[in-house]
Curated annotation (Swiss-Prot):
This is Transaminase htyB. The modification N6-(pyridoxal phosphate)lysine is found at residue 203. Pathway: Antifungal biosynthesis. The keyword Transferase applies.
Amino acid sequence: MIATEYPRPPLAGIDWNHLGFEPVEVNGHIESRFSPSTKTWSTPTFIPDPYIRIHGLTPALNYGQQIFEGLKAFRTPSGSITVFRPDQNAHRFARSARAVSIPPIPTDIFLEAVHLAVGMNSEFVPPVGTGAALYIRPLAFASSATVGLALASEFLFCVYVLPVAPLHKHSGENDKDRKKRGVRALVVEDFDRAAPRGTGDVKVGGNYGPALGRIDAARQEGYGLTLHLDSQSRSLVDEFSTSGFIGVRKENDDELKLVVSDSQQIVASVTIDSICEIARGFGWAVEKRSIAFTEVSEFVEVYAAGTAAMLVPVQSVERRSTGEFIQYSVDYAEPTSVFAQLYKALSGVQQGLVPDQWGWTQEVLRPKQLASQDTEADT
């Protein structure tokens, strides 16, 4: 028997330099089911298609009892494939599950499913040097049928993958201008993303569905980002619709300081946590605290940060109700900009271009299921 090459090389026929953020047909997805009798999740299984058959009266479809995650895998110069900080996503996924009464997926099951999804679709991991990645979307939901507002007994955990470009690569600016000046941001003022003591700090669809129309409307006007303020006072920065907020201050002695929000209504960002660690390694200060909107004009650089977006420089922030228009004149493409230094360091670790001194990446080894397919093909 001749074993299939692993990792498989990038699939021919895909234009890796011009990916978007839309689904691509891959080999399949992963499923694990929760047993109400044993109170355990099953061993993750590879399903060779993208479809799920469920009852139309599940609490997931009717009452929003569902959660999701997002992380990425990269192909490295050595030829291996790695996933970036999946353990942190596992912890966040479990926290989201508890928030909507879904049995938390154990970390080992989560990691096994993620590694299996990537390994069984290794030819869809983009080549080195394209800036693209394999986006990984874990999701879980109540799958048993019930019309009444009662706890479900059955649940399904899935992991999907798709090759993608950075989320805001095509956000109204041409690529050259986006890298140099950043994207425009608009403050959302007719809608509160999350309520105090609500679900803003977990990844549930209800936090995102109502924002979709506003994101699209802003995009039609040339804004690549929409920014949310706190729902209680509307005076504090919460986060962008798709990612977290980072501001950079330059103190009188030219000391650099990254400022991130400590709001209890936002999702804990793995990307922001990583960027803050990198900044500390550069000797820069990091503050996690409330950010008044009035302070936004005092920052010398501003970014949106998240798994899908990675790190996106912001050109301007506009708040129409007050007529405020805050513009940042920095050349983000300049290698000495704070953005350029952080982006290079983060992408370097993710793509295996620099040593991973933090132990953030996990190599995806050859799945046992792939070996089984080789055996079947040989017989």
